[in-house]
Amino acid sequence: MAFQKARALQEAEKLVSQGKSAQAIKQYQEILDKDPADVSLLNTVGDLYIRDRNVPEGLKQFQKLAEAYVREGFNVKAIAIYRKISKLDTNSVDTLLKLAELYQLQGLSREAR
């Protein structure tokens, strides 16, 4: 049977609306396995992990997303995700260094400090 992404997304969203985060995460992961280019789903999965109080796993998803945005040249989007990470993990020096680097690339020297 062919993969029907739209149907799979609807099912995942339905699970979220029913409060079934763990099942929704599994559904989103299956979608990502079949369509790894849809990195925006990593944000959704990360948010679901955070909602379930699994911060380490949520941070992993956000980190993957930020790295994908950097690879694709979407520095502003990467900055937004790294800022999200820094709010959840206030002790991450690596995140702050990455933010400073991206701010510099964007010509935002004041923010880099």
Model-derived segments and their meaning:
Residues M1-R113:
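Repeat-based scaffolding regions
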